[in-house]
């Protein structure tokens, strides 16, 4: 299959692209910036992959979106995303909007373009959206990120049910990574800490909040990305109606327990 992955310059997106290429798929790995594109092209070239191409695709950029429309792909993995930290009370509206612009609206836009292309050309295909366990379980001072991921998961749920009416071979899946040591969560926690300024009602607790967030993610995070990459590969290749792909196992169990106890 011909697969496009957004946000593939590093971490989960990068490793997923390599594994899918190793399994014989043709993979388009995309990056947010031109600099990332150059670096990733060098990496791919050094690894000797002939079935991988690298493209710059800023999912918020209208020019790049026009370029995306020209790709003839079977699978879209909407992986690109950002994490904006900060209290709901403190966070400025522009930061919240930008978090949703990347994680929700831009992801929605790509999905809409991709699916309309499949439908108009009478093709089968798969849309895989990377959400997060944070879209189900709330994390204090990361409300913007949690909310954006909850929104994209719900959109995918509705989309999955709508597609059924078309009687097409189009599969919609959501991947929910738990905590992994990719650097993403660390940056988000730092941004949460930076957002607590002297005029914040949380300022006196700033150090305590930062330490608690770091401890939570330090205890929960896994170094190996293997478990979540396996789930994404399954979402690409499995012939079933499974919707949510979640890993690691311990956090999958925690999500189930939380669902039982939250009310």
Model-identified regions with their sequence ranges:
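Conserved glycine-rich cofactor-binding loop
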Residues: 9-10
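Conserved glycine-rich Rossmann-like NAD(P)H-binding loop of the short-chain dehydrogenase/reductase
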Residues: 23-38
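Substrate-binding pocket helix/loop in short-chain dehydrogenase/reductase
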Residues: 65, 87-88, 95-97
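Conserved NAD(P)H cofactor-binding loop of Rossmann-fold oxidoreductase domains
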Residues: 79-84
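Active-site helix of classical SDR
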Residues: 111, 148-151
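Residue(s) in the substrate-gating loop at a strand-loop-helix junction
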Residues: 132
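SDR active-site lid
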Residues: 165-240
